[in-house]
Amino acid sequence: MQLEKMITEGSNAASAEIDRVSTLEMCRIINDEDKTVPLAVERVLPDIAAAIDVIHAQVSGGGRLIYLGAGTSGRLGILDASECPPTYGVKPGLVVGLIAGGEYAIQHAVEGAEDSREGGVNDLKNIGLTAQDVVVGIAASGRTPYVIAGLEYARQLGCRTVGISCNPGSAVSSTAEFAITPVVGAEVVTGSSRMKAGTAQKLVLNMLSTGLMIKSGKVFGNLMVDVVATNEKLHVRQVNIVKNATGCNAEQAEAALIACERNCKTAIVMVLKNLDADEAKKCLDQHGGFIRKALEKE
């Protein structure tokens, strides 16, 4: 697909005079365009749901969720991956973010990195990609060689693959087994796909990782019950989570957390089933770490 024919490279009539308006009007134009992004994502919810189910199945079988992208797309993948361990208590290697050009490219532009097909393949080889893994290729344009080659290599290995782009009929969409294509239209600044396209990608990634964690028992109700208390804010959040899940007071919640080495799930089961820490942990282990299953009457 030729670059000039891509929707993400089109000219947006709503912002044609944006360099001549007041600062407030400039903000209104950008905001009005941003409002269209969730609607574009809404139109592809069935595709997102299908991808979540596949990702969950693979991760449940011992696989990993791997994001692959260049520039803004790569950085968004890294951002999503890096938030999973503290939020959901998973090991750092379960959700992986790879970016064309490597770690240096997180903060700097690396010329030619996104055009390297070899780079996409080598980065996946370097993390020991296996058929159990799911590779999610992210590219607003849908034409990034680094991402396309990575998806091709992943499929050759037998991996399940997902392609996220904002141009229908793109190479990324056709290469991946599952395509997620929120069409957000032309950007406020022509071709600046870090804006609406990047926002759409972030919303999709939020759903993929959050959906995976919910289906993996990392959420009880709407509480992040595997959160790791790495700072004072999260320490307080743990107490509030146990309080909200059980109806106990702060002192009881803190006592339960101390008794089980600050594991919210265990503390919740301790309080609700009147068990000690070891008994509660054993009960959770017997039910795959799912609180709801652990609370069901035998």
From Swiss-Prot:
Keyword Iron (UniProt): no
Record's keyword terms, sorted: Carbohydrate metabolism, Lyase
Involved pathway(s): Amino-sugar metabolism; 1,6-anhydro-N-acetylmuramate degradation; Amino-sugar metabolism; N-acetylmuramate degradation; Cell wall biogenesis; peptidoglycan recycling
Catalytic activity field: N-acetyl-D-muramate 6-phosphate + H2O = N-acetyl-D-glucosamine 6-phosphate + (R)-lactate
Biological process terms in GO annotation: 1,6-anhydro-N-acetyl-beta-muramic acid catabolic process; amino sugar catabolic process; N-acetylmuramic acid catabolic process; peptidoglycan turnover
SUPFAM superfamilies in the cross-refs: SIS domain (SSF53697)
GO MF annotation: an example: carbohydrate derivative binding
Active site (catalytic residues): 83, 114
Expression triggers: Induced by MurNAc 6-phosphate that releases the repressor MurR from the DNA. Repressed by MurR in the absence of MurNAc 6-phosphate.
PROSITE patterns for the chain: GCKR, SIS
Subunit structure: Homodimer.
Stated role: Specifically catalyzes the cleavage of the D-lactyl ether substituent of MurNAc 6-phosphate, producing GlcNAc 6-phosphate and D-lactate. Together with AnmK, is also required for the utilization of anhydro-N-acetylmuramic acid (anhMurNAc) either imported from the medium or derived from its own cell wall murein, and thus plays a role in cell wall recycling.
Family the entry assigns: Belongs to the GCKR-like family. MurNAc-6-P etherase subfamily.
Protein name per Swiss-Prot or TrEMBL: N-acetylmuramic acid 6-phosphate etherase
